[in-house]
Amino acid sequence: MEKSKNFRIDALLAVDPPRAASAQSAPLALVTSLAAAASGTGGGGGGGGASGGTSGSCSPASSEPPAAPADRLRAESPSPPRLLAAHCALLPKPGFLGAGGGGGGTGGGHGGPHHHAHPGAAAAAAAAAAAAAAGGLALGLHPGGAQGGAGLPAQAALYGHPVYGYSAAAAAAALAGQHPALSYSYPQVQGAHPAHPADPIKLGAGTFQLDQWLRASTAGMILPKMPDFNSQAQSNLLGKCRRPRTAFTSQQLLELEHQFKLNKYLSRPKRFEVATSLMLTETQVKIWFQNRRMKWKRSKKAKEQAAQEAEKQKGGGGGAGKGGAEEPGAEELLGPPAPGDKGSGRRLRDLRDSDPEEDEDEDDEDHFPYSNGASVHAASSDCSSEDDSPPPRPSHQPAPQ
């Protein structure tokens, strides 16, 4: 008997430290894994429920005779899923913790001091722990990934939605089937990720065009751009890019003409002032003034050419009259001139009246019959006829008498 008692004491001493360690490790893991105060209190409740479950489960073993203490110690030792659930911070929703943790606490209170087991509560707590452990194994990809409905939104915000949300629904269904009080929270858990598997498909369909555009642009393909407002007009100009012509209003044209009359060239401050007052850009005002100056220069040149032509016409008529008055005096003083002198005079007149422009040359050719050279030529022909017939000569001699 003494040996058996010593064996029991040694066995109890050998097993008690793991029990204390397991009892302390679960609350420590729960406290360190939780950030919110409410979830911390729920974690304490969950720990109480687990301890209550263990005490309730070991109470029937204490009533039996101590025939197999090793089997009893093995039954009391925590199972690997429970350790995994404790270290992975497996916690349901806060409301869920209030109900389940409270039940576990009551079960622990009854089972601890009175050594009285409640089979229904103990079975529900054990099933809940097993289902939570299974859910933790299925969802434990991220740190704290096996948390309940309260942890899912935070987990989705930090790590994104898990690809397989059906494991959470399966764990919820298992827990709801074990205890009727746990069934209210799982439609919310299922509703938290109803369209979640389709999210990657939607993202892929939405980003397909952008991805295709980026790949094509990096590959060097020419992609269609947004059509310009004058793309059709540009295509009709044989590939030439031409800006549309600016349509000025009548008020703008009047003001621009007024400014052009005041000054043909605008300074930059004045150009800015005119452009601002007329709701135009400085480039538009500058180009309008350039075009207006070119038009003004062309009109000025045309007026000068018309004035020169008029002066030539007047000069040609006056020269013909003067030549007719001078010729009789020359004939009286010097006699009939030689034919070579007449030709040289005509050539000098042609060189003096010549103009590089064709229209003026044509005008000069039209005016040649009225020019001095033409009259001299006519007189020379008369003189040549007079040279051939000597009788008209005496007719000129009585004139000086």
From Swiss-Prot:
Q: Which SMART domains does the UniProt entry name for this protein?
A: HOX (SM00389)
Q: Where in the cell is it found?
A: Nucleus
Question: What's in the GO CC field?
Answer: chromatin; cytosol; nucleolus; nucleoplasm; nucleus
Residues recorded as bearing Phosphoserine in the entry: S77, S79
Enumerate composition-biased segments (Basic and acidic residues).
Answer: 302-314, 343-354
Disorder named in the UniProt entry = Currarino syndrome: The triad of a presacral tumor, sacral agenesis and anorectal malformation constitutes the Currarino syndrome which is caused by dorsal-ventral patterning defects during embryonic development. The syndrome occurs in the majority of patients as an autosomal dominant trait.
Q: What is this protein called?
A: Motor neuron and pancreas homeobox protein 1
Q: What is the lineage of its organism?
A: Eukaryota, Metazoa, Chordata, Craniata, Vertebrata
Gene this protein is translated from = MNX1
